[in-house]
Amino acid sequence: MKRTFSGLLAAAALVSLSSPVHAAGTYAATQYPIVLAHGLMGWDTAAGIDYWYGITGDLKSNGAKVYTTKVSAVNSSEVRGEQLVQQIQTILAVTGAKKVNLIGHSQGNQSVRYAAAVIPNQVASATSVSGTTGGSPVADIIAGVAPGGSFTNVVLNAVIGGLGQLIDLFSGSPGLPANGNAVLTSLTTSGAANFNRNFPQGVPTTRCAQGAAVVNGVRYYSWSGTGLITSGLDISDYPLAGTALAFKGQPNDGLVGQCDSHLGVVIRSDYALNHLDTINHFFGVTGRVDPVALYRQHANRLKNAGL
């Protein structure tokens, strides 16, 4: 069954979950469990819709033990990172595993990096998918039109916070703290730069380069795309093509720039995928690149690395 952790759950409740399903294949059978961390406005399962659409099931069918986590849909990367750390501790306690392989999408990049920095002895790898290592100029623009203390900022904070709480409610995690201003600050280029100073592990020291492959025993990886209109049938393509204008012609996926997504070993950062394609949304309608296969291949990469 799907293993979902909404906030820090009691270990006794987790133990009551059914035993892991024995998978038919072993291609993705990593030594350590794979733990998925969602991005901004994210969820695990909400109203029957998986954030990691088709990804968890494919990994399991190829032998992986996969856990999806649920942190605040809207909050600072530090708050979300600490929530993730607590859930990792629970997963380790229940499974008996010594470490986990973390994969974070979008703002989940900062969540997994926080966890890897705080508990490196319990993290085998940290992988960023379409991650906000360098922040986003889209967040810069929003912050610019709604400066702190302004009426616009008050309204925007209320709207973003309210949406986050609604997502948390529908995903079965009501009561998680929400802070629109905090998340906006985290995702601006200046906010990301500050986060990088505090958590530099795996961050490239030269723009557009790769970062350190291993820091404190944790392996760092990343991949992302530069696609926009990747499928005419995917309605999310069109707003992402609009937000892409914020990048002034630089390669991007609609929300994150190509170079700003780099972390550790860059597997590839120019897939024909946009920001939502990399989690196989909306509902598996993507272009010529299969995003599900990328996760399967990465699990095999981790397996072959002894992770």
Regions found by a protein language model. Name each.
Residues S19-A23:
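Sec/Tat signal peptide C-region and signal peptidase I cleavage site
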Residues A37-L40, T69-V74, H105-S106, S128-T132, ...:
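Active-site-proximal beta-strand/loop segments in catalytic clefts of secreted hydrolases
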Residues M1-L8:
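Bacterial N-terminal signal peptides that target proteins for export
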Residues L9-S16:
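Bacterial N-terminal signal peptides
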Residues T205-L307:
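C-terminal catalytic-base region of ester-bond hydrolases, centering on the histidine
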Residues S173-S231:
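Serine-hydrolase catalytic core
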Residues H38, E82-A192, D253:
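Serine-dependent carboxylesterase/thioesterase catalytic core
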Residues G25-V100, G148-L156:
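Active-site catalytic motif of lipid deacylating hydrolases and related acyltransferases
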